[in-house]
């Protein structure tokens, strides 16, 4: 049961071969067995999940089922879900019970999907290793001594360990794609504004975007059909005609132009990862694609630009956590100002504090022009680089991450080294483009352990259907997306 695609599961549910209650219980049993070690979930509520499964079975019996009705989906703990604890991986929201559903949760509920639980994440989505969570680090199912990536590391580990059929994530600078790469699954960050941000706890509002994490491009296309659409409650939501993201699946890739940015294959890319990506490019050649070289000259500026803009927005967004209206409040304080200081000092972890300090600094009167304004100008240049590249090609291919999964704690005391994990993904967020990672093979770590490698596919604005087809066609001639970690009983 746990190795079937979303479409296969939907067919099995429709034919009454299995019930949603049985499927949900199977995943809950696996969570009880494996989650104490992997730590992919922060909150599981079997009573709520099974009630949704019973309702889904009734919908199926009534002939009112959609493609995801009855299918258990894990939700990143950044989305408010009514009646569920919603922590964002932080002590600040340790006991916060959401009073309403996020737009994304509403859409899955309307589709009849089952909320299997809330997945672990880097605190307030700030991290690339899922080591900053107040609720403990997440283990990579491929090697328990390694990180799953972040910030959507819990969702990635849950999908990889077959603790859910699929999951949601959010991506501010690579937080869907990088963990998808490190855990050997597929993940998609849609064009900025396609998926509702209503009820999604904000990190950097001009960069955050929700997206699917699953085993295959086909599974992600089905999820995109549910997740995307205009939401008037979200000021960044785009009004566009509803799309069917499965419509391109299976189309020939003959004649499609694929761009390879030379900057993505320069110094800093692990040799084993480079070899896997080159093999994937060769596969696309065999499928009829035309390979062209493109240039993204401002790529290397994306990290410093991001670490000015994202912390600036975070320092503003996180100012609401003051211990007054909701969130952690210090037990002892002398006056109101002391309460603010102690509540925030106790409630936020070190990485969150670091980014708030950076953001406050770059927004200060003496440095606004030198840092924040300059970063916005370079952000525009990065977007223009992509626009020029897409005049020469239809899709851009490259590595998702510069290396395979690293050891837990290896980069914990070196923030710059950690930040460089997103060197190939951040520019996509800065430009607002869609980006996707799919499994492309395995490469050896320094100790010889073979670990998953992700291939990144970048498209032009609103070109998700073409990207998903490119991933789907590749997955029809390879089996990387079907591989399972050892020790994960099927």
From Swiss-Prot:
GO biological process, one term: translation
Keywords attached to this entry: ATP-binding, Ligase, Nucleotide-binding, Protein biosynthesis
Listed Gene3D superfamilies: Amidase signature (AS) domain (3.90.1300.10)
Gene Ontology MF: a single term: glutaminyl-tRNA synthase (glutamine-hydrolyzing) activity
Classification via InterPro entries: Amidase, Amidase_CS, Amidase_dom, AS_sf, GatA
Annotated catalysed reactions: L-glutamyl-tRNA(Gln) + L-glutamine + ATP + H2O = L-glutaminyl-tRNA(Gln) + L-glutamate + ADP + phosphate + H(+)
Any one of the GO CC terms: glutamyl-tRNA(Gln) amidotransferase complex
Catalytic center residues: 76, 151, 175
EC number: 6.3.5.7
Domain of life: Bacteria
NCBIfam families: gatA
Quaternary data: Heterotrimer of A, B and C subunits.
Family the entry assigns: Belongs to the amidase family. GatA subfamily.
Function according to Swiss-Prot or TrEMBL: Allows the formation of correctly charged Gln-tRNA(Gln) through the transamidation of misacylated Glu-tRNA(Gln) in organisms which lack glutaminyl-tRNA synthetase. The reaction takes place in the presence of glutamine and ATP through an activated gamma-phospho-Glu-tRNA(Gln).
Protein name per its UniProtKB record: Glutamyl-tRNA(Gln) amidotransferase subunit A
Organismal lineage: Bacteria, Pseudomonadati, Pseudomonadota, Betaproteobacteria, Nitrosomonadales
Gene from which the chain derives: gatA
